[in-house]
Amino acid sequence: INAAAPADQLAQDAAAAKEAAAAVEEATDGAIKIDVVAGGTLGGEADTLDMAIQGDLAIATCANSVLANYIPEMAILDQAFLWDSQDQANYAVQNELGALINEKAEKLGIHVIGYMESGFRDVFSKKPIQTIDDFKGVKIRTMQNQGQLAAFTSFGANPVALAAGEQFTALQQGTIDACENAVSNCWVNKFYEAGVNSVTTTHHSFVYIPLCMSDNAWNQIPDDLKETFVEAVWAGCEQQWQFLNEANEEADRKSTRLNS
């Protein structure tokens, strides 16, 4: 089974996907093996999701906003300040909300077998942003979804939807003044080398990374192994949550020095 990982995926995401693959292989006594193809080799998030829906790829990983293009109800997850905590956000997709999403996904020909996450997003900027008024006129890169664009417009900023890979150059060239993502991304992508000198903890949105498995691949798993398979995938997702927390804690410590 091939699982695709996007080009801008954090290192801990790829590591967690491989942990999940190892857990699946062990739990099924080698009956199910997952080959994680990282680095966007198989295409971007939208491309690989399309491949999974068409049955040409076993597992695609993407931001929840990408899947929302097919499941409009998921757009609610892009709303600003939706969750108070990571536990609250994770509970939602592990229970009723997750079941509803999977019901919709199955009509597309895919199964959502787990959720990794990019987690809460914060703001990185060239000038300190300490109050809501400081957002006025700031050109900030956001994800390509209406929820984030609307949120930052309401703050008084000028949001610009750019692909993740374009952020560094846009900061360098002055096309944008700020960007937003998980705080660890500021360091993974070395935005401080492109002029970022301030990190503002906003936690304005929470981003999931659903694992979408094609019907073709799902139907190849023996019925007596399906539950074991999904449990192992979820165990890998929970490991990724921990990896992300550790990376963000380290980034928070670095950000304290950046802001000083």
Residue ranges and their predicted role:
Residues 1-88, 96-99, 103-260:
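N-terminal secretory/targeting leader peptides
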